Amino acid sequence: MAGKKKSKSDSLPLDLDNIKPLDHLQPVPKTRSSSITSIESVDEPGTMKQVLLPPTIREFDELDQFESFVRDETWDNDFDYFHGKLHYYPPFVMKSCQNNLEKIKPTMNKNSKKFRRDLHHHIQKHLIKDLEKCCGYELNFGKGEIVETDNKVTWKFKDETDHGFSKEEEDLYDRHWRLELDVSCTNESAMVDVEYKSIPM
């Protein structure tokens, strides 16, 4: 990817036990202004209004890379404006096949009660807790919602709280944001998809 700046995660390995929490908010980065564009207002035709473009989607195929990306967004003061996707085999799958992808059982998918139970445990006890460390602030996703179709199951989580900061501090810097986390698997494989968004409000 020509033109992309070298990320901190290229040189600094992820250490979940030594990530410094985000103690205080800061002003919105000046670079954010390049993501603002003008569009015609739907409510008042003929008038223009400024909107923030969606952040660039970054895609990953390893959990460590994805978590490093989330950590780096906090370090770069972009914790309230990012969008990452992860397509991976969860650790419990890799452990069961002893890190040999050819040994993954074809029954390891959304139709297996054991697979779903293990994935739900991984989401609640590992993924969300690790993302909270990487973000550096509180995540309040609660139980979430499970949406199921014939070939896919998705756990949907949303956090619209103050993330552990005071309302005064959020108002001072105009830093109000919501988080959306979707984790899904299909009936075709043990591969899991994660979509994680931080959206300014």
From Swiss-Prot:
Residues 1-38 are annotated as: Disordered. Its main location: membrane. GO terms for cellular component: plasma membrane. Keywords: Cell membrane, Membrane. It is found in: Cell membrane. One of its GO terms (biological process) is energy reserve metabolic process. It comes from the Eukaryota. Pfam families: RGI1. It is a peripheral membrane protein. Involved in the control of energetic metabolism and significantly contribute to cell fitness, especially under respiratory growth conditions. Belongs to the RGI1 family. This is Respiratory growth induced protein 1. It comes from Candida dubliniensis (strain CD36 / ATCC MYA-646 / CBS 7987 / NCPF 3949 / NRRL Y-17841) (Yeast). The lineage of its organism: Eukaryota, Fungi, Dikarya, Ascomycota, Saccharomycotina.
